[in-house]
Amino acid sequence: GGVGIFTGRVPFVWISNAFTNTGVEKKGTTISSSVPGMANYHQAIQDVITAGTTKKPEIAVVQKSFKYPQVFRANLAVEQTLPGNVKLQLEGIYSKTMNNVFFENLALTKVGEVFAVPGVNASAAPFYSNASSAYENIINLKNTNKGYSYALSAQLEKYFDFGLDVAASYTYGRSRSVNDGTSSVAYSNWKYNYSRDTNGPGEMGYSKFDIPHRVMVRLNYNSPKYCQGWLSTSVGIVYTGTSGGRYSLTMNEKDDFNGDGWRGNNLLYIPTKDELSKMNFIASTDKKGNVTTADQARQLFEDWIQGNSYARTHRGQYAERNSCMTDWENNIDLHFGQSIHLKNLVRLEFTLDVINFTNMLNKRWGTTYGNAYNVSPIMVNKIVKTGAAGNIVAEPSYTYNPNANPTPSDIASRWHMQLGFRIAF
């Protein structure tokens, strides 16, 4: 085992955002008088400049005290040989965030509150307005010390004299964070970090990389040399089962729910049955002309809540970031290797690997959800604001969104095959 403070590879793009998003852009174009109709191009350029409009720029800044991400980490491992020459390995690892990235928008100021359910304090969230007359967004990069992760694993392994190696392992883990820093762009790291208060001090939630359960079974066979020592064969199969991927429950937004300038980054408030009756649903019409009345939308939302295990057990509160899990994922990979042993210890090896062999057997097997970031069962249709700045009360109206369940990734779920050749000496 051991303990220490660790820093991984630093994404310097987080720092370079401040150099590439300064609020000033220089662009040029070349217009030749030889182009038909451009004999008087000086006046044409002047007309464009005069008629043009200026959009407020966006800038990225880095707090002076910013430090590269660091974690305190401790691990302990034990290995024991059991009867039958079976190896048992136990390991635990714990990491505590010391410095991680956190993004905030300095152009925003709180001007009131928005109530997901009118009059229900538990559903209140800060309502923002752009306080800068010069900038659209001012994304500040600073640190947070919130966050931790741990993992406990156990593995059994047995090696047989005839060349078979068998291993099985199970890992239980938990990872929580404020911002996973999944984007290279400062603005994206801020706007896609789903939360109740999108510009607040930082809300802890499950990390996008959290995998509570993982099961792995591995079988490898390496044959002895045959055909007078010219050939040998290796075959491997690996099964991996994981408890799906994490995703957030959010609100789709036709109108900006909390005035932060971005639509779709607000976590869903899950109403109680009584609160649901107070929500302002309105009728909607889909692309085929089918009408959903307000009462039907309300009932459909209730049915969706009852069908989602997390929402059903967390009514009367905002959903946590990455609170939900996709279905359990099963994957089998195959490996076949054929070696030709030449003189002078030179070996030619031909390999065949089938990734996601499960899907090769049946197109409904081996599916994965890939990056299922969020689902939104309701749409914020319109925000009605009352009161003066500093004491604004905002209330939304909703429509129901029928496409509110994660779907498997078509590309990531497909099997693929790889052929290889190498010379070893």
Regions found by a protein language model. Give the residues of each.
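Outer-membrane beta-barrel "beta-signal"
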Residues: 165, 412-425
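Gram-negative outer-membrane beta-barrel transporters
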Residues: 91-229, 234-244
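Short loop/turn motifs that connect adjacent beta-strands in outer-membrane beta-barrel proteins
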Residues: 84-85, 163, 224-233, 341-350
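Residue-level signature of outer-membrane beta-barrel architecture
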Residues: 5, 80, 154, 158, ...
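Extracytoplasmic gating/loop element in the C-terminal half of outer-membrane beta-barrel translocons
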Residues: 234-344, 371-406
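Solvent-exposed loop/turn elements at secondary-structure boundaries
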Residues: 2-142, 316, 327, 397
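Hydrophobic, lipid-facing positions within transmembrane beta-strands of outer-membrane proteins
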Residues: 62, 72-76, 150-154, 213-219, ...
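Membrane-embedded beta-strand positions of outer-membrane beta-barrel proteins
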Residues: 1, 78, 90, 156, ...
